[in-house]
């Protein structure tokens, strides 16, 4: 294994991403940001096809995988996640959106807010993305500035509806494509957007003092070195030599020791909350750790099957169910990075739950999950998101 370049932490690190309706320009904007910042020596220009390159992409013409690019502004280092736009692939948005300290909501001025605009705002709210900046894209294609004003008002109203400060949220107008093509004015708007992101999205208070927890997103083997689990550190810190537990999906807790750590393909001394890292685990076989489990500080989190939850059930126009559900309903609960089937028991006096309801009920999972009070999840059936919520009380 060749000596890796060492990742040096000099600027505060922030995770952001692009969200919004399919074809409104999320990936084009991501490419434009890297291109404009590259001219200042703060990024490597990534072209659209690089960011958009996911094997499934070519077959169906829709973005499926979550792309991560990195860049810097004068003030910060960013990891930027390009959230998939298509409703069928909201599953990846769920793993992705959970990775954001703030989001850039991309809305095409030619269209205004669309169903997935609403869906992504809702998901951002549910997975704890507290700061959104708006980029009104394709403004060059709208002749009447009053129409753009109208779209901006609609977007602000929609954000307010989901408890964001719609009146105060910064809105930048521009054209990602023109910026990508080198138009000076369009590029200035991209710089303005990044200045606003720098200022409006606060440097997150990292949860570095809490016990280490990292949901496992991917597992792979490095020949001759062992098994690597990768994901975003949820809280705490990790370094080589630390003892960790692999928790979830099975009753038995597996213990291991961290023997290597890297980020952005560079070795890392200390991984901390918010970092996307690969953790090399001693004495663990490739099949002993799977997506959906968590790596955790010993004794810090247990597995549970039964809990109480506060849940928002999506309305039909948000892509949710058309009909109510009752006790004994058995959907999938998407925790951390995986689906687990669970049975719902409604509280006494509640006969059914309607789309659009905000409700509380008890869940019994068929497999143990590494959860605690405050753990967020989404509810899915047949591949579509029908609800979102969080654990309010552990019952077993």
Swiss-Prot record:
* Biological function: GTP hydrolase that promotes the GTP-dependent binding of aminoacyl-tRNA to the A-site of ribosomes during protein biosynthesis.
Subcellular location, in the record's words?
Cytoplasm
Organism in which the protein naturally occurs: Lactobacillus acidophilus (strain ATCC 700396 / NCK56 / N2 / NCFM)
What's the family? Belongs to the TRAFAC class translation factor GTPase superfamily. Classic translation factor GTPase family. EF-Tu/EF-1A subfamily.
Where it mainly occurs, coarsely classed, is cytoplasm
In this chain, Mg(2+) is annotated as bound at 27
Which stretches of sequence are listed as region G3? 82-85
Q: What class of enzyme is it?
A: hydrolase
One Pfam family named in its UniProt record: GTP_EFTU_D2
This protein's assembly is summarised as: Monomer.
User: Which stretches does the entry tag as region G1?
Assistant: 20-27
Q: According to the lineage, what is the superkingdom? A: Bacteria
What's its catalytic activity? GTP + H2O = GDP + phosphate + H(+)
User: Which positions in this protein are listed as binding GTP?
Assistant: 20-27, 82-86, 137-140
Enumerate the residue ranges of region (G4).
137-140
Signal peptide positions (record) = none
Annotated region (G5), positions in chain: 175-177
- Protein name, as recorded: Elongation factor Tu
